[in-house]
Amino acid sequence: ALDVQSQVREDLRIVAMSATLDGERLAGFLEAPRLSSAGRSFPVEIAHFPARRDEALEPQTRRAVEHALSTHPGDVLVFLPGHREITRVHSALQDVLAPAVQVLPLHGELSVEAQSQVLQPDPQGRRRVVLATNVAESSVTLPGVRVVIDSGLAREPHYDPN
């Protein structure tokens, strides 16, 4: 990006945003000022939903979502490990919740248009259940979400030199 900016588009500005990078080192490397923005905190209530070892992820997630919808207002965000699980849970939830609740997937393989739909309230005013990978944990704020269900599962890339 620095090469393009310096050689092709001097008018181009680079903005690097991260909650985890060392801001001072990055600002020094880019020879740029460091800007800071304070986040906001909200009260959080943590509850554990009992898992059933003999039950697959899809029915467990369905039970947790149905419980959340019946006991809490607002939309529900569910973190799942990957595209395959999102597709399976989406199908299971569509069968029991549609058309009263909008069930939306959110992962990197979706079109930009489909991803943007998640950022908008449902045009029919329905509650929403958003099924996302853990990438959404730190990259996007979804309006209307009042309950987050975390499966506790995530895919983490590993490098194997062999």
Give the positions of each predicted feature.
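P-loop NTPase motor module signature
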Residues: A1-N162
